[in-house]
C-alpha cells in the first residue's frame, strides 16, 4: 500500500516569508483509494462523465440546471417563475413558487404509494437484560399521521405561519415529528441541543422571539435521567415572548407544570385526528433558525428557507450517500445541529430513505453500543464525526471485533476534518477496506454538503474532501484577494449562489454582511482555509483563525495536528499559536495520549516525530498533555479557547456551546 511522503528537514521548507498571506502547505498525503468495481457498477453516479455533465451544467447554465432539478425533485402546489434572483449578498430561489418541506419529506411518498416503507427506526438508550428497552418504527404513512396530529396540536396552541417554535428535546421520533409539523404549517423551528443551559435557551428564545417551547420531562444519557423540563422552566423565567410549553413524557419523572402555560404532548397531540394537510408556502418562507456560536458576542441565528434548502438537502443526500432502496441509513448526529436537520430529517426523508435514530451515548452500556446497533439493524450507511472515530480508536479494537459489520457498504465523516490516521482506521477497521469513505465538507450556513467524494467514482485521499458537488463553485484567495496555486492554501470562498445557502443571520443584517460578504466582493467567505492540489482535490486547513505565522511562514494547524495524531501513542491533538518575540508565533500543541507517561522524553519524541513527518518549521515549541480537549457539544475542538490558554489570556467570546468546562479549568490551573 502506498504511504504518505513527508518533508524530512527544514531544507524542504520555503525559504522566504510569505508576503501575499497565502498558507504554506507542508504535509504531503499521496495514498489513493479507488471504489471497488462492484460498488461502482451499482452506484447512482457510476461514471466520471455523469459527474462532469452535472457539474458543467450547474456551473455554466445554473438557471436551466436548477429549474430541471426543482421540477423533478420537489412537489409544487404553484409553479415558480425566476429560478434565482441574485442581488448580492441576497438570493431568492424559485421565486413565487409554492411548496412545503414537510410534504416533500413525508406526504409525497405516501401519495406515490410508498406509505408502507419504513421511514424511521428508533432506539432509546436504556437497556434491560442486555437488550434495548425502547424501540419503535414508523412507516411513511404512520409518520404522516403523527406529523399531522402534531400540526393540529400546534395550531390549537395558536401557532401559525411565521411563529418561532423552540424545540429542546432528546433524539426521539417526536423531535423529528415536531420539526416536520412546524414545516407543515409554516412555523419556524429553532432546535436547541438538549444539553444547553437555561441561559443559552433563554438567549435563543429572546433573539428569535419564540412563541412556544417544545420539550420533554427528561432524557437518558449514560444510564442517568437528565431533567430537561426543569432547565426549560428556568429559561422561561427570562423568555417573555414564550406563551406556551408543550411537554413530552419520555422518562416518567416528575416535571412541574405551570397552569395556563404548560401542556402535555399526550393531551394536546395524541388525540388529534391527524388529517391536517401540508400548507402551500412560498419558496422563501423561513423554514428554521439554527444558532451557531460566534467567536465573540452572542450566538448567530442562521436562517434557512423552504424550497432551496429542501432541494439542496435532498439532492446532496442522494449524490453523496448513493442512496438505494433497501438501505438502512444512520447519521449519528443530534438534531440540535445542522447535520441532524439536513441528514437525519429533511435530506434522507425527502429521498424516501429508511433512517435510524438513536437517543443516547455511544458508550452505554459499553463501548460497543454503536457496533451493536449496526449489527442488529443491519445498517448499510454510517455517517459520523471524526471526534467519534477518535474515541472508538481510544476505546480499542476489541469492541469492534465483537460484531458483524458486514452490512456496511458506505461510511461518511462530518463535522471537522478527519486526520489521515483516523481515516485509515475507519477505512480498515469499520469498513473492512471495502467501504468508500465520503469525507464531507460543509457548514451550518451552507445548508448541506458542499464538497465530498461521490462514492461510486471518486478515488479518495485520506484527509481530503476531494471535489465540489454540482452547483458549488469554490475559489481560494490570499489576503490580497488573489487566487493561489496548488502549493499554497488560502481563504475558501464560494463564487456562485447555490439553493441551500443561508438567507441571513436572524435579525442582524449588518452582521450577516460583515461576516460573510465583506471580505471578497460578491463571494461567500466560508471562514475556512483550504488548498486545492494538482488533481483538483480540496483540503480543508482549518478556520481562518487556525493559521500560525511562524517566522513569516503561514502554517495550517490541521497539518501539524495530523502529524501528531499519526504517532501511535497520540489519541487527539489540537495545535494553536501563541505570541513569540522572535518568530511572531510559536507552535503550542495540546495532546491526549494512551497510557504513555507524560514526561519530557515523550514530548521530545513527539517533536521529533513532527519534524520527521513535516519538517523543522512545523515542530511544536510547546507540548502540553491533557486528559481531554475542550470541545463544543457537537464534538468540535474549541481552538480559540486553547489560544487564550496558550497565551495566558483571560477567556473571551461565547462559551455557551462548550461541553465540559472541567478540561479547560484543569489547563488553566496548570498555568
UniProtKB/Swiss-Prot annotation:
It is an enzyme of class 6 (ligase). The keyword Translocase does not apply. Residues 1-21 are annotated as: Disordered. Catalyzes the conversion of acetate into acetyl-CoA (AcCoA), an essential intermediate at the junction of anabolic and catabolic pathways. AcsA undergoes a two-step reaction. In the first half reaction, AcsA combines acetate with ATP to form acetyl-adenylate (AcAMP) intermediate. In the second half reaction, it can then transfer the acetyl group from AcAMP to the sulfhydryl group of CoA, forming the product AcCoA. This is Acetyl-coenzyme A synthetase. One of its GO terms (biological process) is acetyl-CoA biosynthetic process from acetate. The keyword Ligase applies. NCBIfam families: Ac_CoA_lig_AcsA, PRK00174.1. Mg(2+) binds at residues 565, 567, 570.
